[in-house]
C-alpha cells in the first residue's frame, strides 16, 4: 500500500467485525454493529484507526460483560464532518471498574490505543460510563488535507 493510497474504512471494519467474536472465546453471545460511515482515509491513518477500533471492540468483548450475561452488544458509531471523524465504541456491559482511569491504565491494549489516537492520528480519546449500564469510548480524529472528506456510496 502506498502512502497516497486511500482506504475505505467501512469495508475494512465490516470485514473484520464478524471474525472478532470467533477470536474472543467468550461464553456470552456478543452482537457487534456499526452505525454511520467512517468513510475514506489515507492508508497510514486508516491503518492506525482500524487498529484502534479493533482493539476497543476486542477490549469490550473481553471485559465488558459478566460471565453470567445472557448476551451483549457492542456498537461502533461514526459521524463524519468536513473537519472531524467522531467514533464511539459503545458496549451495554457492566461499566468501568471502580477507580478506573484511562490516563493511568497500565493495560497494554489501552496504552497502544492512547498512543495511536494522540500521536499517530493527532486526535483525542475519552472513556466514560453510560447511565443505566455500559461504557462509551469516544475518539475524535481531525480530517487533514491528506484525508478524503468523502463518504463512499
Task: Show where each model-derived region lies.
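Short beta-to-alpha transition helix within the HATPase_c
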Residues: 3-23
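C-terminal end segment of the histidine kinase catalytic
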Residues: 131-133, 138-153
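Conserved glycine-/histidine-rich ATP-lid loop and adjacent helix of the Bergerat-fold HATPase_c
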Residues: 112-122
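Short beta-strand/loop element within the Bergerat-fold HATPase_c
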Residues: 71-83
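Glycine-rich ATP-binding loops of the HATPase_c
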Residues: 121-129
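Conserved short strand/loop->alpha-helix "switch" segment adjacent to the catalytic nucleotide/phosphoryl-transfer site
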Residues: 7, 25-55, 62-73, 100
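Glycine-rich/acidic phosphate-handling loop/turn and adjacent ATP-lid/helix
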Residues: 84-111
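Short beta-strand element(s) in the Bergerat
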Residues: 30, 83-87, 135
Amino acid at each position: 500500500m502506498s502512502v497516497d493510497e486511500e482506504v475505505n474504512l467501512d469495508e475494512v471494519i465490516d470485514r473484520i467485525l464478524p471474525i472478532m467474536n470467533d477470536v474472543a472465546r467468550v461464553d456470552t453471545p456478543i452482537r457487534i454493529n456499526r452505525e454511520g460511515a467512517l468513510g475514506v482515509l489515507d492508508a497510514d491513518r486508516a491503518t492506525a484507526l482500524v487498529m484502534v477500533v479493533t482493539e476497543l471492540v476486542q477490549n469490550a468483548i473481553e471485559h465488558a460483560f459478566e460471565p453470567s450475561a445472557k448476551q451483549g452488544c457492542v456498537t461502533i458509531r461514526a459521524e463524519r464532518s468536513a473537519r472531524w471523524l467522531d467514533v464511539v465504541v459503545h458496549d451495554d456491559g457492566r461499566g468501568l471498574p471502580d477507580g478506573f482511569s484511562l490516563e493511568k491504565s497500565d493495560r497494554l491494549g489501552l496504552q497502544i490505543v492512547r498512543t495511536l489516537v494522540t500521536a499517530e492520528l493527532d486526535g483525542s480519546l475519552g472513556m466514560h460510563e453510560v447511565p443505566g449500564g455500559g461504557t462509551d469510548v469516544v475518539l475524535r480524529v481531525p480530517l487533514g488535507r491528506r484525508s478524503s472528506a468523502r463518504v463512499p456510496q
